[in-house]
Amino acid sequence: MPTIVSYKWTLINNLKISDNQLEELLFKLKSEVKPIDADHVEIEVNNDRPDLFFPYGIIRAAKGILGKELGEPKYDIKQSVYSFEVKEVKSRPYAVAGIVKDIKLDDESLRELIQFQEKLHITVGRKRKKVAIGIHDLDKITSTKIYYKPLPLDYKFIPLNQSKLMTIKEVIEQTPQGREYGNISIYDGLSPAIVEENGDVLSIPPIINSDKTRIDEKTRNIFIDVTGTSFEAVSSTLDILVTDLAEMGGKIELLNFISPSKFEFSPLLRRYTVSVSANYISKNLGINLSLNEIEKYLRMARFDTKVLNDVVEVTVPPYRVDILSQIDLVEEIAMTIGYDKLSPKDYTIKATGKLSAETELIRTLRDLSIGAGFSEIFTFILSNDKRLRNEYVSIVNPVTVEYNAVRNSLIPTLLNFLKYNQHAIMPVYVFEIGDVVIKDKRTDTGYKNSLRAVYGIMNSKVNYEDLQSRVHQILMSLDIEPTYKTYLDDMFIPGRGAKIIDTSKSVEIGVIGEINPVLLEELEIEFPVVISEIYLDSLVKR
């Protein structure tokens, strides 16, 4: 979980509490605190609460638990004279911007603000791949019109902490930030950029800001840009930033927002409602709460509420990105009450667990297979589509072409295993039990998992009977009497392949045969191979 370092006295003085009370409060916020020195503490915060990555976000939440402030905070929001226009940027198409005025920064709060930015980069931003943030001194921006657009790599500006003009290409090649993040956003020789109307660069996200708009302790008015690959992510990140800064006493200003989106102003500061009944809360918490009590606890968690009949309608603030459904509100109530105040209850239903029929079959089959002289292997369920036949599930945007499909049979992965183990001492006896994914129109997705077993023998001399005798004995040990029916398939040598039939049910339960030399040559396997695949789904039901 993310950890932040905070100036202890910011928290204690704003909340008017002791060190011990601070520890108790943070525990109620699912956070842990430990001292670093006389003035600083390290706080471990949950990933799902990015609004707590900044001390003033913690102060806002803690004031609710203490009962000092209830409901959603009301911020001073005005319309700005500034505009922010988003042009087409193919590599990172989404951008939003906001302004916060009249903040007071000192050495500690400046460090905490930069830390806040970096924690958001690492978590929500996925190391700037999904979201990147630029924080600027608004008073150093000379134009009221600001643009997000692509720039050529020979465009020049002075990057942060540099003293000379550099091209974007030089920044990427010569600065630590450029070497780390430069490959994220460059597309077709162009880089995303935040630019003033006069052409001055404010930043080239996700790499670096311009030195022109560097923030320091004298900064009082801030311009924030947030860019990335997800509109939802960039807009919610900006909401978190401006509302946390507003807790310092800052005043939020909305920019005129010109973009392909339907929104006219930025930040969006969107709210939504979640309705929850008293019965649902009581059932999940195990205690009976009245509607008035539910309202009280939710307002302590800094939500605005409205009671409609037996339901509480909860307005979720823009910065609470962790609230997705009713159960999240139940957790908020539990945290506000305090988990130490909730008594555990014994289960009223007692039952004895046992292995499933599928697990029993797998264990028995594994023992029988090892007893028959086979060694077990484990291969990936993902495979290369060139190895598969018939219909299979393809992977969208695979990490590597080697794993761009889901196997629909265990045979291709076993053959691939044998290909890379031809150096082993012969003969090679191997088996695998695992899932494949096959077509099934009766399911919602059109596909289903199917449990199978595969057996293979590779040797300088091997034939159908060498494997058939072993597979036959294994099936007989499972109380299955198999019969064999000729099976013609390109995979097998003609006349040397068969379907395996469960005699009692007249159901096909597998195939067996000698692999065609043509296929072996394609796979670069130099030894004869005989293989059998057993369909275990029908056997589980016995």
UniProtKB/Swiss-Prot annotation:
Mg(2+) binds at D322, D328, E331, E332. It comes from the Archaea. GO terms for molecular function: ATP binding; magnesium ion binding; phenylalanine-tRNA ligase activity; RNA binding. Its main location: cytoplasm. Its cofactor is Mg(2+). Keywords: Aminoacyl-tRNA synthetase, ATP-binding, Cytoplasm, Ligase, Magnesium, Metal-binding, Nucleotide-binding, Protein biosynthesis. SMART domains: B3_4, B5. One of its GO terms (cellular component) is phenylalanine-tRNA ligase complex. Residues 269-344 form the B5 domain. Its EC number is 6.1.1.20. GO terms for biological process: phenylalanyl-tRNA aminoacylation. It is found in: Cytoplasm. Belongs to the phenylalanyl-tRNA synthetase beta subunit family. Type 2 subfamily. Tetramer of two alpha and two beta subunits. PANTHER family: PHENYLALANINE--TRNA LIGASE BETA SUBUNIT, PHENYLALANYL-TRNA SYNTHETASE BETA CHAIN AND LEUCINE-RICH REPEAT-CONTAINING PROTEIN 47. This is Phenylalanine--tRNA ligase beta subunit. It comes from Sulfolobus acidocaldarius (strain ATCC 33909 / DSM 639 / JCM 8929 / NBRC 15157 / NCIMB 11770).
